[in-house]
Structure formats: structure tokens, C-alpha cells
Swiss-Prot record:
Its cofactor is Cu(2+). It comes from Bos taurus. It is a single-pass type I membrane protein. Its EC number is 1.14.18.1. This is Tyrosinase. The chain crosses the membrane at residues 474-494.
């Protein structure tokens, strides 16, 4: 009944975030390299007549890149989105969207002036109706074609530079699976050759801001699809977990008793078909994923390579990550040491902070542990546990931001791997967002986490803690300095007093001080003339 009711709401709401807007998938838009669709409210491009935005040239960052990608002009994702479009909508004030038809995160209302703060909650804190609604929303998104977005099934070159558009419809859920595939896929070099050392959303500084935006857009899509403006993605707090406690039919799907690699027939997700999971096949054909179904969702939690991932992350691991003061370091990739980002992502040891190519920990550990569809980066978003997992990873990122209050320039401006500089536009989003745009507190984007709200009184203490620790380290020096200072002050005071007394005794009467010494002052009698 709930699912049927949700379907009835579908065409009452329009989506506003994703990859290629349907309105910009024509040969005219591609050959003119312009994506400035009209806003339905006034019929003008980008809602210009209503002051919502205007069509403007895309200004690309010229900051130098790291050495990881030695090519130029071979990948459609380079200098995003310039291969496809060099003019897009630039929205004003709190407006957002490919046609400036929606509001920035954290705002709502007809003029996007009303602030709002949504709260992401632990999935185990949801009531049964709330949990069932969440599962139904995911199922609806999986089976509803995106009204506003399509996915390209060929490169720009394969489209004859835009004259022969190649696009397919895709469901709301699979749109995000496709985006995660597209951002992390290998570069196609021709003749079955590929370049693998490239990823516009992982293994570099943009990992956390990119996934922050990704979840916000996914959340927003489901809000608009269902008409539930208060929907938020729940999180799974996997600290100290001994097994996959969300892997039950009540939640994200239990194990199939007949085949441990499949989900239980009683699960919401056992009938789901996955997409974009066959990277090597696409590479051999020099093709892109076209959204075709590729079989059932696979998951066999715990039966993974335990030499690479001995256990799930602990509370101590998380605390160590949060103790790392540097967001990024060194080469700014998966070899970075003492980098908060690299340690949280799982390429560095959460005990030492040293990069270790033989181990997968923290964020990576959960992907490996699931031992199935979620364990391969490009297609990992097929598994809905991806949402719960990345919501919790994002909450750890939020803890770090609140602890250190970094300025924007803490995020690297230059020399990061391709696509990861601060001013680089994030692939493959249209409208456009820069990496640095989401190096901000979640509250600035209109959401919070329930368990961080509970610890709100400790935020001030966290803020001053580094200063208190510094004061504690220099306390012995301060005491010693105070003692020496007191002795010097007493000696100098005595010498000054002695010199002043001698000088006073030598002064003529008219230059004697009006007040006498303390012992003489007490001998004076106030005499009245009355």
C-alpha cells in the first residue's frame, strides 16, 4: 500500500540533481556546448527573468595537477565539464539546480529563504514504520525512471562530438550507481588499452567532499521523488561491530540459505538487478556502462580476505583518525602518511597513520568485508548498505571539521591528483560544484547527525582542547618563569626604592613630594580651623 501511494506521487515532483540533464542531451546542446535549460516558473533560461540565475561561461581552474595522470585530452572527465559544455546555469542567492529551479542544501520555500536543518539518524533508532518507509523509498527509487536525467552510453568522441547523442534512461537509484561508476572508471585509451591510476572521487583529497555532495544529492532526489521533504539517509555505526548487524531481512537483507553469495528471498533487495559492475568488460570493448541489468545483488559478509582486512574498524581506530591534524599530506594520494583523509579512507594504518598497500582498513574495510557487489569500487553503490556506510563515514568527517575548524585553504589548492584540486569541478555533476564547496560543516549544508547533536555541549571543549594541551606542556616553564620574574621584580623594586629615596633627600624643599613616606604619613594630624 505504501509503495503504491508513493508511485502516485511520482510525477508531482521534479528532480534537480544528477548527471546529464535530459534537457541538455540534444545534439544542439552538445554541439553548442551549452546547458542552460529554462526554468518552468518563467520560461527563461536559468530562471533569469525571476532573478534565479543566468547562463554564464564555465571558468576552469588553472592550478597545476599532480603527476599521477600523464595524459591530456584523452578523457571526457578532464577539465570537467568542458568537453561537453562550456556554458551552464550559474544560480544566484540560495537557488540551485541545472536550471536554478531548486534551493541550495539547507534552504526551502518559494524563494529559498527558509533555513532548515535535517537530522540523519542511526538506522537502529528508527521505528518500524520509519525503517519500512526508508526501505520502500529505496525500492521506489530503484524502479522509477529519472524524469530529469539520462546517462551517456558513449564517449563524446563516440557521439561524433555531439552530433549523434548516445543516452539512455535510468532509474533514480541507478542514476547514482552510474555516477559512482563513471567517476571512478578507468581512462579508455583505445585498442583495449586503459589507464587505471585515475579516480575523480577516491584516493585523493576530494574523497570526503565528493561523497558528501553525492549523498546530499541522492537524499534530495528521494525527497523530491516521494514528496517527503524531511527524508534523511540513516547511518550505520559500525564501530566495534563483530559482524554485519544490518544484514538481516528486517533491515538490508539477510543471507540466502541456499546460496551464501545471494540475499535472502525475504529481503526487500533480493530481486534487485545491479548495473555498472563489469568494468573489465567495458574496458575491453572501450565502452561505457549503459545501465543494462547485470544480475542479482551479491553479498557474503565476513567471508572475505582476512589477511587484507582482519576486522571491522574499532572506536579506537576512529579516535586515532580524529587525532590526525593534517587533512592531506605528501603526494595527496593513497600513499599519503599521517593524512586524516587517507587514514579514514582506509589506505593508511589506523594505528600509525602510515600508508600500507597490503591492508584495507576503515572505510575500505567495510567494502572488503561485504565480499560482493559492494567490494568493487565502480559498482559498489548498487548495494544499499553503501548509503548507510557512507553516511557514517561522512559523520566522522564532520567530527574532524568540528574539532579543528579548518579554513578553506587547508584543502589543497594545487598539485593534487586530477580532479581533486580545491577549485576543480567535481565529476560528473551538473550543476557544477567545486571540491572546496563541501569542505564545510554539515550544518552549513542543512543537516546534522543525531549522535553529534547529543555531544553538542562538548564542542567548545573540543575547540579549546588543543590550547589546553599546549598550555599543559609549557606549564613547568611558565611556573619557572613566574618565580624568576618575581625575584627579579623584587630586586629591581628594592633598588628603585633606594635610589628614589636618595634622590629625594637631595631635592630642594619646593620639589619635595607632597606625600611623605608611609611611616611618616601615619604621624600626621588633620587639623581643623573651625
Amino acid at each position: 500500500m505504501l509503495l503504491a501511494a508513493l508511485y502516485c506521487l511520482l510525477w508531482s515532483f521534479r528532480t534537480s540533481a544528477g548527471h546529464f540533464p535530459r534537457a541538455c542531451a540534444s545534439s544542439k546542446s552538445l554541439t553548442e556546448k551549452e546547458c542552460c535549460p529554462p526554468w518552468a516558473g518563467d520560461g527563461s533560461p536559468c530562471g533569469r527573468l525571476s532573478g534565479r540565475g543566468s547562463c554564464q561561461d564555465v571558468i576552469l581552474s588553472t592550478a597545476p595537477l599532480g603527476p599521477q595522470f600523464p595524459f591530456t585530452g584523452v578523457d571526457d572527465r578532464e577539465s570537467w565539464p568542458s568537453i561537453f559544455y562550456n556554458r551552464t546555469c550559474q544560480c544566484f542567492s540560495n537557488f540551485m539546480g541545472f536550471n536554478c529551479g531548486s534551493c541550495k542544501f539547507g534552504f526551502r520555500g518559494p524563494r529559498c529563504t527558509e533555513r532548515r536543518l535535517l537530522v540523519r539518524r542511526n538506522i537502529f533508532d528508527l521505528s518500524v514504520p520509519e525503517k519500512n518507509k526508508f526501505l520502500a523509498y529505496l525500492t521506489l527509487a530503484k524502479h522509477t525512471t529519472s524524469p530529469d536525467y539520462v546517462i551517456p552510453t558513449g564517449t563524446y568522441g563516440q557521439m561524433n562530438h555531439g552530433t549523434t547523442p548516445l543516452f539512455n534512461d535510468v532509474s533514480v537509484y541507478d542514476l547514482f550507481v552510474w555516477m559512482h561508476y563513471y567517476v571512478s572508471r578507468d581512462t579508455l585509451l583505445g585498442d583495449s588499452e586503459v589507464w587505471r591510476d585515475i579516480d575523480f572521487a577516491h584516493e585523493a583529497p576530494g574523497f570526503l567532499p565528493w561523497h558528501r555532495l553525492f549523498l546530499l544529492l541522492w537524499e534530495q532526489e528521494i525527497q523530491k521523488l516521494t514528496g517527503d521533504e524531511n527524508f534523511t539517509i540513516p547511518y550505520w555505526d559500525w564501530r566495534d561491530a563483530e559482524n554485519c548487524d544490518v544484514c538481516t531481512d528486517e533491515y538490508m537483507g539477510g543471507r540466502n540459505p541456499a546460496n551464501p553469495n545471494l540475499l535472502s528471498p525475504a529481503s526487500f533487495f533480493s530481486s534487485w538487478q545491479i548495473v555498472c559492475s563489469r568494468l573489465e568488460e567495458y574496458n575491453s570493448r572501450q565502452a561505457l556502462c549503459n545501465g543494462t541489468s547485470e544480475g542479482p545483488l551479491l553479498r557474503n559478509p565476513g567471508n572475505h580476505d582476512k589477511a587484507r582486512t582482519p576486522r571491522l574498524p574499532s572506536s579506537a581506530d576512529v579516535e586515532f583518525c580524529l587525532s590526525l591534524t593534517q587533512y592531506e599530506s605528501g603526494s595527496m594520494d593513497k600513499a599519503a602518511n599521517f593524512s586524516f583523509r587517507n587514514t579514514l579512507e582506509g589506505f593508511a594504518d589506523p594505528v600509525t597513520g602510515i600508508a600500507d598497500a597490503s591492508q584495507s582498513s576503515m572505510h575500505n574495510a567495510l567494502h572488503i568485508y561485504m565480499n560482493g557487489t559492494m567490494s568493487q569500487v565502480p559498482g559498489s553503490a548498487n548495494d544499499p548498505i553503501f548509503l548507510l556506510h557512507h553516511a557514517f563515514v561522512d559523520s566522522i568527517f564532520e567530527q574532524w571539521l568540528r574539532k579543528y575548524h579548518p579554513l578553506q585553504d587547508v584543502y589543497p589548492e594545487a598539485n593534487a591528483p586530477i580532479g581533486h584540486n580545491r577549485e576543480s569541478y567535481m565529476v560528473p555533476f551538473i550543476p557544477l560544484y567545486r571540491n572546496g564547496d563541501f569542505f564545510i560543516s554539515s550544518k552549513d549544508x542543512g543537516y546534522d547527525y543525531s549522535y553529534l547533536q547529543d555531544s553538542e555541549p562538548d564542542i567548545f571543549q573540543d575547540y579549546i582542547k588543543p590550547y589546553l594541551e599546549q598550555a599543559q606542556r609549557i606549564w613547568p616553564w611558565l611556573i619557572g618563569a613566574a618565580v624568576v620574574g618575581s625575584v627579579l621584580t623584587a630586586v629591581l623594586g628594592g633598588l628603585t626604592s633606594l635610589l628614589c629615596r636618595r634622590k629625594r633627600n637631595q631635592l630642594p624643599e619646593e620639589k619635595q613630594p607632597l606625600l611623605m613616606e608611609k611611616e611618616d604619613y601615619h604621624n600626621l594630624m588633620y587639623q581643623s580651623h573651625l
